[in-house]
């Protein structure tokens, strides 16, 4: 609202209905991803809505980046500064080796592209697997983690590889293997979580070819997860 008033932005009808939950589930009602060049916040706030928020999945990276803008506006800290004492340090992630790219000239973390180690990604996934707890401390709210690891919206229509059409939680994809969810970065940076089997898999790769990440998932299913499912 402050941005809208300051710059007299012409916002589309229905924008006020968008909630953080809609951003987390990629259901903000926009049919396409707003331009992240220039003033991405203004671009987001002036993008028309095609669907009623909460009813239709459409992957929207700019929406996720808006979470960083919200944190900066409300706390005066970027995402990395905000999360360091509340999450990173508590689960053993060294913030010095975690890089969160920023939008140029804004101080806002969230521009697509974070750099983290395989082990640090594993730590975050293990925290989720434990219901948001780490060494007996509730680091992430249990309810948030529980809902994140549930299908909140169908993605059956998504023009993605097969494992992109199995549903979506809170910034987490459901996998074609029932009960399995994943953090999914570019070119196959994965953390797979299987709560029922108390299993986490973290991997880095450079799957740049067509359907490369899907091939990686298929190999994991065929060589590991299918056998575990029978145990």
Regions picked out by a protein language model, each given a short descriptive name:
Residues 1-25, 46, 75-111:
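Active-site helix/loop module of the DD-peptidase/beta-lactamase fold
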Residues 2-33, 52, 62-65, 116-119:
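Conserved catalytic neighborhood of penicillin-recognizing serine enzymes
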Residues 9-14, 51-59, 107-115, 183-187:
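Solvent-exposed loop and edge beta-strand segments that line ligand/cofactor-binding
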Residues 23, 58-87, 121-131, 198-201:
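Alpha-helical scaffold elements that line and support the substrate/ligand-binding pocket
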Residues 45-46, 101-116, 166-176:
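Carbohydrate-binding/catalytic loop surfaces
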Residues 84, 88-148:
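Active-site-proximal binding-pocket segments
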Residues 94-98, 146-202:
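Active-site Gly/Thr loop motif
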Residues 183-231:
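Structured C-terminal helix/loop/strand segments within mature extracytoplasmic catalytic/sensor domains
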């Amino acid at each position: 609202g402050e941005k809208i008033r300051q710059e007299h932005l012409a916002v589309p009808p229905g924008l006020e209905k968008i909630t953080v939950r809609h951003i987390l589930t990629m259901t903000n009602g926009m049919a396409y991803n707003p331009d992240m060049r220039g003033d991405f916040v203004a671009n987001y706030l002036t993008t028309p809505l095609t669907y009623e928020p909460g009813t239709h999945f459409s992957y929207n990276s700019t929406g996720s980046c808006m979470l960083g803008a919200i944190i900066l506006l409300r706390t005066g800290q970027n995402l990395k500064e905000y999360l360091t004492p509340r999450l990173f340090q508590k689960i053993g992630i060294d913030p010095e080796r975690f890089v969160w790219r920023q939008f140029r000239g804004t101080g806002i973390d969230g521009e697509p592209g974070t750099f983290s180690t395989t082990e640090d990604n594993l730590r975050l996934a293990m925290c989720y697997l434990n219901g948001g707890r780490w060494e007996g401390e509730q680091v992430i709210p249990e309810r948030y983690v529980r809902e994140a690891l549930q299908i909140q919206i169908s993605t059956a229509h998504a023009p993605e590889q097969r494992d992109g059409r199995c549903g979506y939680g809170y910034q987490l994809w459901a996998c074609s293997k029932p009960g399995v969810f994943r953090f999914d970065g570019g070119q196959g940076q994965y953390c797979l979580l299987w709560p029922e089997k108390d299993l986490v898999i973290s991997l880095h790769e450079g799957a740049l070819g067509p359907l490369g990440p899907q091939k990686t998932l298929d190999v994991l299913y065929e060589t590991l997860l299918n056998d575990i499912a029978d145990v």
